[in-house]
């Protein structure tokens, strides 16, 4: 899900009516802070770098403290790793906050679809674009293959914080299941709507604030980064507060069903879980970002929420979006830091600034679809698609199976969690297109309400709901969908030529990638969907050469294991100072030892608290 749920900073700098200004000026009401003090410690760290001095881990025994029997984990170097470039500091860092705002106002134009256009001309861009090399390396570089080294990793309590739709949650659920196989205790914290989905997979669940349906509807109404009016500002404030306020409890509160105590020793999060890095700072634990869309600056393609006139400004587009997001959330984040975490407020270009560029980051797409950019260093991994195998347990209705077998492979058409302004009109376009192209079609109702027909469903159409894509797509000749990262990945793995009908955010990015690689036609924005262009797209996808191109990629994807690579990246980026369990000095003999009551502390210190941010 694209990160666009908050008010736009430029609206503070340009003309606004008094109602909007008043709404933006209001602060979150004060509420009681969550107690982050460990049970056996009544004080907080005086170290300004962290809000707490330690966190407690799960009990471990003398012989049960390692993840695998031989006490070793073998690591393999990422196939996409290309070494570490030297650090570069922007000369922008020397400017005041007011000067930065002025530059951004001159650089940015807001588009009707809510995205930002970066104007690459004049002195402002030159100032932002100028680099100043610094001495040293950005991170530890791996001179030898990681397969030559071994590490013993203690079992950890891991909190995974995910904000978004089901498509955003699904790859993290796959990762959570794999982490559990290593002996970790994993809690997946996401919206209450997905409680049964997560628990059915055998993973501990904790609810985060925010309603994914409302978030999706907000983004569909407002497209990119800009709320359309005062009422939208109020709605997204409410969502933002609910999300941020729930992050700390998700990392320290007992399980709501079993009352089993929990305190995160490591955090995995996606960028829209705003506040993640501040919770990690307060708890003194490492954090690893994973996401399904690009969020790390690169010269090879622009930020999915930005438009730029030429490649010279690609890198700059990430800085612009980053700044705008930070200016939108800074009041809430600093209130959260002071009121809940007992941390000092921060400015954007402080040690804990507003980006994820200095955090270990894993991107959940195949390097064969979007290779790792050459300017992303060893902190960043492109791990591959993280599939959750749902199709193996799916039992379709007999009626559905008979319909599939009666004719040629159908075309799938569905828009997942995306809301539709006029479901009937969209359905009319779909039906007329299938008639025009003489194709059978499977229409997924989704959250948009497709398929509510006044008449009988035509024989060439079958309506489905909650059908696993990894079972459904292999039955299809081609797929038409909104372009969510997970849906796109599943279609490609099934060997289906793809037409993307983007609504907002990274969906346009994936539509462009599909078209560039010859895996489908040019994307059709939902507002431009018509019988003519949808019919043309279906005919394009049914060409043998397009099918052949997609099948070639599908064979490659079949041999990838993005979940394993993601878990490997998480383990590899854990702090080297991570202490291992030690025997209790108070034990008198083997028989007198307390049952699994050896505790160890994770203290990552300054070396592990990498510069991090507010997104």
Swiss-Prot record:
Result of knocking out the encoding gene: Reduced growth rates. Altered embryonic development, seed suberin accumulation, cutin formation in the seed coat and reduced seed size. Lack of flavanoid accumulation in the seed coat (transparent testa phenotype).
Name of protein: Sterol 3-beta-glucosyltransferase UGT80B1
Tissue-wise expression: Expressed in developing seeds, seedlings, leaves and around the apical tip of cotyledons. In embryo, expressed in the seed coat and cotyledons.
Lineage: superkingdom: Eukaryota
Region of interest (Disordered), residue spans: 1-54
Biased composition range(s): Basic and acidic residues: 40-54
One of the GO BP terms on file: carbohydrate metabolic process
InterPro entries in the cross-refs: EryCIII-like_C, Glycosyltransferase_28, GlycoTrans_28_N, UDP_glucos_trans
Keyword Cell membrane attached: no
Family: Belongs to the glycosyltransferase 28 family.
EC numbers, comma separated: 2.4.1.173
Keywords from the named record: Glycosyltransferase, Lipid biosynthesis, Lipid metabolism, Steroid biosynthesis, Steroid metabolism, Sterol biosynthesis, Sterol metabolism, Transferase
């Amino acid at each position: 899900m694209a990160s666009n749920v908050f008010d736009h900073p430029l609206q503070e700098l340009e003309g606004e009516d008094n109602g909007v200004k008043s709404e933006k000026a209001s602060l979150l009401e004060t509420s009681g802070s969550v107690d982050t003090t460990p049970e056996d410690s009544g004080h907080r760290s005086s170290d300004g770098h962290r809000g707490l001095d330690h966190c407690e881990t799960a009990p471990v025994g003398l012989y049960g403290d390692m993840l695998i029997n031989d006490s070793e984990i073998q690591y393999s170097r990422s196939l996409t790793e290309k070494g570490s470039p030297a650090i570069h500091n922007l000369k922008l860092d020397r400017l005041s906050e007011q000067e930065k705002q002025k530059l951004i106002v001159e650089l940015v134009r807001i588009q009707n679809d809510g995205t930002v256009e970066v104007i690459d001309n004049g002195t402002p861009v030159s100032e932002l674009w100028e680099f100043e090399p610094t001495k040293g390396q950005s991170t530890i570089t791996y001179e030898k293959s990681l397969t030559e080294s071994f590490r013993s990793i203690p079992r950890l309590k891991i909190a995974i914080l995910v904000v978004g739709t089901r498509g955003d949650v699904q790859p993290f659920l796959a990762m959570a299941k794999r982490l559990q196989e290593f002996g970790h205790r994993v809690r997946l914290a996401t919206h209450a709507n997905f409680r049964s989905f997560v628990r059915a997979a055998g993973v501990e669940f904790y609810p985060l604030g925010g309603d994914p349906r409302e978030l999706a509807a907000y983004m569909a109404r407002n497209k990119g980064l800009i709320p359309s009016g005062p009422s939208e500002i109020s709605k997204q404030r409410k969502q933002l507060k609910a999300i941020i306020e729930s992050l700390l409890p998700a990392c320290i509160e007992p399980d709501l069903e079993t009352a089993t105590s929990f305190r995160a020793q490591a955090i995995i999060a996606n960028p829209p879980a705003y506040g993640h890095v501040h919770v990690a700072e307060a708890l003194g634990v490492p954090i690893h970002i994973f996401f399904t869309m690009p969020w790390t600056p690169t010269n090879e393609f622009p930020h999915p929420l930005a438009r730029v006139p030429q490649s010279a400004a690609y890198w700059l587009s990430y800085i612009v979006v980053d700044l705008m997001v930070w200016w939108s959330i800074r009041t809430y984040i600093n209130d959260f830091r002071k009121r809940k975490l007992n941390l000092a407020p921060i400015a954007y270009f402080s040690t804990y600034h507003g980006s994820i560029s200095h955090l270990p980051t894993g991107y959940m797409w195949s390097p064969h679809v979007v290779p790792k950019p050459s300017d992303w260093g060893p902190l960043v991994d492109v791990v591959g698609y993280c599939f959750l195998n749902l199709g193996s347990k799916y039992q379709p209705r007999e009626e559905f199976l008979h319909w599939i077998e009666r004719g040629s492979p159908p075309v799938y058409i569905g828009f997942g969690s995306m809301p539709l302004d006029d479901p009937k009109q969209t359905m009319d376009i779909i039906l007329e297109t299938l008639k025009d192209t003489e194709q059978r079609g499977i229409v997924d109702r989704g959250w948009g309400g497709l398929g509510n027909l006044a008449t009988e469903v035509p024989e060439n159409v079958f309506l489905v709901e909650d059908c696993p894509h990894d079972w459904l797509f292999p039955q299809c000749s081609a797929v038409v969908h909104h372009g969510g990262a997970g849906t796109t990945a599943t279609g490609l793995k099934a060997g289906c030529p793809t037409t993307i009908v983007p609504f907002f955010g990274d969906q346009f990015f994936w539509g462009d990638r599909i078209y560039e690689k010859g895996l489908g036609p040019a994307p059709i924005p939902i507002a431009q969907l018509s019988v003519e262009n949808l019919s043309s797209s279906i005919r394009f996808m049914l060409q043998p050469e397009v099918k052949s191109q997609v099948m070639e990629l599908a064979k490659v994807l079949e041999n990838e294991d993005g979940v394993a690579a993601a878990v490997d990246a998480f383990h590899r980026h854990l702090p080297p100072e991570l202490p291992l369990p030690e025997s209790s000095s108070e034990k008198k003999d083997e028989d007198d030892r307390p049952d699994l009551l050896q505790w160890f502390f994770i203290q990552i210190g300054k070396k592990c608290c990498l510069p991090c941010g507010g997104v």
